[in-house]
Amino acid sequence: YAIDLTSEGQNGVATGIFVNGKDVYASGWYEEGKVKIPFFWKNGQLLRLFSKAENAVTSKIFVSGNDVYVLGNETIYDPVTSHPVSTGVYWKNGNEILLTNDKEGSQANSLFVSGTDVYVVGFRGSFEKIKHGYWINGDFVPLYDSMNCTGLDDIFIVK
């Protein structure tokens, strides 16, 4: 399968790939002007992911059974300060799931699905205090606080 990263003259970026049987999935995003729009491809067919944010990018894709999970990060703007806030997000079968508590930003770095459990690793917090950890089914589990360059970048579940 081929993926056209210049569809309709736009610049595109492929960010992840997953093979499930005979199906090939890829995550990515297109840039339309200054706006980044998330997509994924299945067997070369482009499928748009809808986001409430002005800018959203993808980073990973995972398939479990018939469910397609695409991980990414969005930029939303604080309604009080108008400052940009990064928010981790994943889409399950095209439905957007935000990884935030509406009080602080977050970043999603990797995703793994085991049975019905969805694990996402990353961090949440503000510039003053970052909590590294993971989400399981949307609930954040902090592992440590750090303002250093240390981070969590991948997750796997072994049973």
Task: Put a short name on every predicted segment.
Residues 1-159:
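Residue-level hotspots at or immediately adjacent to binding/recognition sites across diverse folds
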